[in-house]
Amino acid sequence: MISARPWLLYLSVIQAFTTEAQPAESLHTEVPENYGGNFPFYILKLPLPLGRDEGHIVLSGDSNTADQNTFAVDTDSGFLVATRTLDREEKAEYQLQVTLESEDGRILWGPQLVTVHVKDENDQVPQFSQAIYRAQLSQGTRPGVPFLFLEASDGDAPGTANSDLRFHILSQSPPQPLPDMFQLDPHLGALALSPSGSTSLDHALEETYQLLVQVKDMGDQPSGHQAIATVEISIVENSWAPLEPVHLAENLKVVYPHSIAQVHWSGGDVHYQLESQPPGPFDVDTEGMLHVTMELDREAQAEYQLQVRAQNSHGEDYAEPLELQVVVMDENDNAPVCSPHDPTVNIPELSPPGTEIARLSAEDLDAPGSPNSHIVYQLLSPEPEEGAENKAFELDPTSGSVTLGTAPLHAGQSILLQVLAVDLAGSESGLSSTCEVTVMVTDVNNHAPEFINSQIGPVTLPEDVKPGALVATLMATDADLEPAFRLMDFAIEEGDPEGIFDLSWEPDSDHVQLRLRKNLSYEAAPDHKVVVVVSNIEELVGPGPGPAATATVTILVERVVAPLKLDQESYETSIPVSTPAGSLLLTIQPSDPMSRTLRFSLVNDSEGWLCIKEVSGEVHTAQSLQGAQPGDTYTVLVEAQDTDKPGLSTSATVVIHFLKASPVPALTLSAGPSRHLCTPRQDYGVVVSGVSEDPDLANRNGPYSFALGPNPTVQRDWRLQPLNDSHAYLTLALHWVEPGEYMVPVVVHHDTHMWQLQVKVIVCRCNVEGQCMRKVGRMKGMPTKLSAVGVLLGTLAAIGFILILVFTHLALARKDLDQPADSVPLKAAV
């Protein structure tokens, strides 16, 4: 029993060091359980304030009045005291609170928290959970693997020596074959076979062992409380037998989970554990029945390796795990799948039969080597045409190789090949898939270009057509499809040795233009036959070009006849209204009178005033100009036709100005000084002035107008152009006029008056400086033309006489040489 005096002394010492009467945060103290001394038991000096007479101390606990009855506060000493014995197993800790309160309940000091711990004493005896333990032990159990766990408890404080339990085997009955067949873990109470007991267990068939076991507290100390129990162990035969492989059909239609095998561990306290490699839908129940929980798919996993373990409650294996092989049996549940391939295959046209164009293959996920994965190929399309003896494609049913048949293919064709892949070796019940590939027949340059027309023309061209003119356009065609194979080249093969013609075309064009390169000549060649050939730029495959690769262009050269042209584009003259019938007004002539003969006619002589001579082109008044008024104009159209070629014609207008009849005779002005013009014609003329010397005429207002006299020869040979309001310009109309002296009549109009000038012009040959060269008279002593001719004729007669004598002599000499020898007379020698 512990005396209270030392505790009081201890608490007094603590209190001596307390200088402040303030509550501490929390006070902790320890009180031994089962205290056997006097009570009250002084536990702790509380830090109560001095002068606490004004209030009273209040003690409260966490269990209301029960704790208050167990503890109290000595008001005189200020100690916390225990009023009775404490039992740790009843309560190990008390939470107390001390306050100083006034009469009206007001807290003057506190609260002060105090925790009282009850110190444990070894006053509890260990107890087994059972007085007798029974267990079954299977042969083949590994040594050291617990097959039974003994359980015991101690009411003392956990974690202390008072509750630190140790297990021991006190005895084994029977002790055969070895007295230490078993081992017991002293800390855990795990009962297992000892290594020596494991080897001897097979000799103890159906034996029962009884063990006397003890549990003691205070750990390994010799002192302490203890308890005893009995363990009865039955030895049973080992039923942990190997398993045969299990074959399961894939996609098996049964109720799941479906049992496939069973294991059994004959020992007690067994827990079965299942492992699958790879993980699969398998489990095992508490009875050791193995199940598959769902349908299996051989293509996903064809085989599983299962391990079944028999374990104790702590997950330790009693024996080596059992292996179970699960083989998934194949079913024909997978159709062939076409292997990836290029969806389009290009094959050149003209490829020989037997050329492989594609190899279609399929894969079947069913078991390799089984009928379920035995694939046979069948050609679905294109189907051969009815009545056709040849096929475009051939198919190897085993390899899926597609080759060209004997039926020809054409460039540009797009053919969809459909091949059926059937498993079960092509059986009707087999699964199938359709493999497709598009065959594109590519073009080769096997067609030579050809002209659409091999004969063109005849094309008529005038010989004066200018170089560069288009002669003909030749169209060609090429049956090939590839643009590069349709590119053409053109050339002139024959018929143009002089290079008169040329070809032009665009690089990608299918037509060529035959153009003129040089001038044509009717005299040199009135016709041409030009042969043009067309060919491919790319190399031709197969037969060469045929006859249609050439085209012949026939060209006819047309002689050019110069168009009709009059010496003037229009004719104009002025006549008085009093001009009598039959008067010559003017003459219409061709520009080149010596080249052709014309026939003239009037087209629109509405008044019938005029007439024209058909051959000479002279225009006369057909009747009096009745109705004509001065100042009026009268226009007619003259048509000229070629006498030899009536189809050639031309026309010109004739404008007649009517003048007022002069009441007085026409005033003839004296000619001025002589003037000359050069022939052939040069670019200058004679200025004619219209200003009259008559003051009455000269003083009138208005411009002067000029016209040649009505003589046709004058109008043919001369041309008069106005120079200004008072002068005109006279030039030669013809390129050549016979040299001589000419009086050119010029009619002048001024206001209402008219008069005529006689302009004297000398036409002569001129030197390079434009100066007139005049004829000189015959010089004395010079021979005349007649004498010169006589001398020439006499000379020629003399030469002719001499030549006659020479030729006569030569003829006689040749005759003498031709006589035979016997005809020559003998000459006597003298």
Curated annotation (Swiss-Prot):
Domain named Cadherin: residues: 27-128, 133-237, 244-338, 343-451, 457-566, 571-667
Keywords: Calcium, Cell adhesion, Cell membrane, Glycoprotein, Membrane, Metal-binding, Phosphoprotein, Repeat, Signal, Transmembrane, Transmembrane helix
Positions of post-translational Phosphoserine modification: S823
GO MF annotation: an example: calcium ion binding
Glycosylation sites: N519, N604, N724
InterPro entries associated with the record: Cadherin (IPR039808), Cadherin-like_dom (IPR002126), Cadherin-like_sf (IPR015919)
Protein name: Cadherin-16
Organism: Mus musculus (Mouse)
